[in-house]
Structure formats: C-alpha cells, structure tokens
Amino acid sequence: MSISPILLLGGTGQIGHFTIQALRRRYPDLPLLIGSRNRQKAEQVTSELSHAEAVVIDPHADDLGLGERPIGAVAVLYSDERLASLRYAHARGIPHLGISSGVYEVAPEIAIHMQHPDATAMVLGYEWLVGATTIATLTAAKAYARVDGIRIGALVDEEDRGGPAVTEDFERFASVTSSVLARREGAFAWRKGDEAGFSFRAIDARNWRLPASRRST
C-alpha cells in the first residue's frame, strides 16, 4: 500500500531536525518531503535520510509550488503569517499541524476551519513546546492513585539550543503582548502588570520569579 509523504515545512531548522529524528524512530519507512525556500538546505537534510525528498516551497502560490503531487499531511514548524500551508491542506482535505502561533493568533486559523469543518483534521499544537511538558506530566501522573494538583514551570535559558525561527517566535510573543491568559477559580482572564509575572520552583530547588517582560505565552 502506497503512503503519501508528510510535508515538513521548516524541516531544515533545529526543530525540524528533532522532529525528523522522532518520526524516524517511530516510523522508519515513512516518506517525507522536506520543504524549504532554499533547495540547498533541504537537500543537505535529505542527503542523510532514506525515504525523503527535498522540495522548494513557494509560500505565495496556492499549491505551494508543489503542483498536483500527492501529500498525506502537512506540518509547519515556523510561524506561517500567510496561513499558506493551512489553506493548502484545507483545500485538499489533508491533516495540518501548526506549532508556532500564540493563543492570541489562532482566530484566523479557526475561521478557515469553521468554513468547512469536515474537510480535514486541523491540530493547533500551540501549548508549551507543543505539549512536551503536558504529555510528560500526564504520563507521570498515571503512577499515582490520586492527584490533588499539577503545577508546571518551564524556563528557557538564553543558551538553550534553537534556530532563528525559535528566536523569532519568542521575540514576537514578547513584543505583541504583555498580558497572560490564566484560569482562576474556573474562569479565564488576562493577567496584566505585576499580576502577569510568574514564579515557580525549579528542579534545583531554587525559586524563580519572572516579571511579565521575561515570560512568553
């Protein structure tokens, strides 16, 4: 049975590297298309992979420059301001995963899906690190008969590895909002000013207090 490839947009960056590694461990024969505006970068990635092909993406074209070639799913690993990848996937009825929008940026994407909700699956992977902390916490919680509360704190060090797209995302989040969407006593509300700061206890037992200007959504 032939399987259409997954199109990875942003597959040449740091996040793309880890994504490909994870996919290969789980699905070693899964065909991949590594999409980039730079063919040389895409070919550099695919030269080290089996069942992978480099493709040049045109974000201004309705078909992303791919023509009629079959695609099984689309994953975009950077901020797609034009929503070109989502429109492409939605028009063809194939699943789409995006990971780089903030909670305040999802309305245009949801609006596209609402126009034809049964066209395809759309995953809004915008929770912290695409759910890495959430999934790990829920997995650990299964060992307990009862859980009274869960508190997750995540601190990104300025020396943590990440490509330019990651840096761009954090700078965008910090520049466009100074408030935090929080849930208190069952109600969601925007915390502003001093209330937007956050404190948590790190694994080395130190207490961290971060002002609003130093945190990301």
List where the protein language model places each region.
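Conserved glycine-rich Rossmann-like NAD(P)H-binding loop of the short-chain dehydrogenase/reductase
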Residues: P28-R39
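NAD(P)H-binding glycine-rich loop region in Rossmannoid oxidoreductase-like domains
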Residues: Q40-P108
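Short alpha-helices
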Residues: V123-K142
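A structural signal for isolated positions on well-ordered beta-strands in alpha/beta enzyme cores
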Residues: L7, P31-L33, E53, R151
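Active-site-lining helix/loop region of Rossmann-like oxidoreductase modules
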Residues: L9-G10, Q14-H17, K142-T217
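Rossmann-fold NAD(P)-binding glycine/threonine-rich loop
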Residues: S100-M122
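Canonical Rossmann dinucleotide-binding motif of NAD(H)/NADP(H)-dependent dehydrogenases/reductases
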Residues: S4-R26
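General beta-strand structural signal in soluble alpha/beta enzymes
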Residues: G98, M122-L124, I152
